[in-house]
Structure formats: structure tokens, C-alpha cells
């Protein structure tokens, strides 16, 4: 065994170690102006569609939040109530501020449009009801929302809202 080590040392005598020549790709600088512009547009969209002062006439006389856009078939609300539509996108708003919730709602509606999803679920939770009462008021202002209804028990019950989006 020692002979092998000696043989190796004699054979490799005078050899210089190879320098590490790994190429590190330069980091791409994110264009800060583009990022700021994108954030500003998202904020403008939420402010444009979701006004806090608007008080729509919602059908909540029996404690169930529901809305149907003018010109839509009244059967849609019944289908939403029964759970005939399965939500493909889910949004959980627990613990968010009003401004954060507005931005998330706008992002959800944009995602529904981009991914061709017509039904989504918004989890509002039970909590202090500030978001739970405000979210339907915001949603009815958006032109893409066809209908909304309190979710059936299997999709969240009183703590969630199902929405139908116009594609």
C-alpha cells in the first residue's frame, strides 16, 4: 500500500493545482421603474374597481349574501347556492388589511380571466366581519363578476363566498 502512495507522489511531483474557473453568471438587474410601474397599475386597478363608499343593494335579507348582475339568468344564484359550480381558484383573506384584500381580489379576478376560470371561492372567515361585509360590496363593482353567493357548506359555508366570473 505504501508503495502505491510513493509511486503516486513521484508521478504527480511538480504538477500545479488547477485554478477554479467556474463561471458565475452576472445578476440581471431588475428594472426598478418597471416594478414600481407594475405595482402602481395594480393599485390603480383596485382603486378604480373597488370603492369603499359604494353601497350596493345586495340581496341579504335572509342573512345570506348574494348578488346577480343585471341581465343574468336568475337560475345562476340557485346553482351557486346548491354547489353546482366547483371553484377552481381559492383565495384566503384571513389576516389581511382592507388594502391588501383589495389587491388580492383584483389579482384573483385577473387570474380567473387569464386562466379561463369561471368560478372561484373567497374565504373571508368569521372574524370581526369587516372584510366579510366589505368584500361583496367591492365585488359587485367589478364588471367581470356575474354573480356571487355565500358558499355551500362543502366550500366554506358562511366563511366563504363563491363568485362567477365573466370570461
Curated annotation (Swiss-Prot):
Matches recorded under Pfam families: Smr
The keyword Nuclease belongs to this UniProt entry's keyword annotation: yes
EC id: 3.1.-.-
Matching Gene3D superfamilies: 3.30.1370.110
All copies of domain Smr, residue ranges: 91-166
EC category name: hydrolase
Keywords in alphabetical order: Endonuclease, Hydrolase, Nuclease, RNA-binding, rRNA-binding
Source species, domain of life: Bacteria
GO molecular function, one term: RNA endonuclease activity
Disulfide feature: none
SUPFAM superfamilies named in the record: SMR domain-like
Subunit details: Associates with collided ribosomes, but not with correctly translating polysomes.
Function in brief: Acts as a ribosome collision sensor. Detects stalled/collided disomes (pairs of ribosomes where the leading ribosome is stalled and a second ribosome has collided with it) and endonucleolytically cleaves mRNA at the 5' boundary of the stalled ribosome. Stalled/collided disomes form a new interface (primarily via the 30S subunits) that binds SmrB. Cleaved mRNA becomes available for tmRNA ligation, leading to ribosomal subunit dissociation and rescue of stalled ribosomes.
Assigned protein family: Belongs to the SmrB family.
Protein name as annotated: Ribosome rescue factor SmrB
Amino acid at each position: 500500500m505504501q508503495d502505491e502512495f510513493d509511486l503516486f507522489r513521484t508521478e504527480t511531483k511538480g504538477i500545479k493545482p488547477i485554478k477554479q474557473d467556474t463561471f458565475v453568471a452576472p445578476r440581471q438587474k431588475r428594472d426598478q421603474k418597471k416594478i414600481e410601474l407594475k405595482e402602481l397599475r395594480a393599485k390603480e386597478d383596485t382603486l378604480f374597481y373597488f370603492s369603499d363608499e359604494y353601497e350596493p343593494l345586495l340581496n341579504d335579507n335572509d342573512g345570506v349574501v348574494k348578488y346577480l348582475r343585471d341581465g343574468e339568468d336568475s337560475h345562476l344564484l340557485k346553482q351557486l347556492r346548491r354547489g353546482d359550480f366547483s371553484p377552481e381558484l381559492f383565495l384566503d383573506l384571513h389576516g389581511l388589511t382592507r388594502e391588501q384584500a383589495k389587491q388580492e381580489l383584483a389579482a384573483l379576478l385577473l387570474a380567473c380571466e387569464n386562466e379561463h376560470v369561471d368560478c372561484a371561492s373567497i374565504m373571508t372567515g368569521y372574524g370581526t366581519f369587516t372584510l366579510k361585509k366589505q368584500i361583496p360590496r367591492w365585488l359587485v363593482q367589478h364588471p367581470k363578476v356575474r354573480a356571487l353567493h355565500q358558499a355551500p357548506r362543502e366550500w366554506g359555508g358562511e366563511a366563504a363566498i363563491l363568485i362567477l366570473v365573466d370570461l
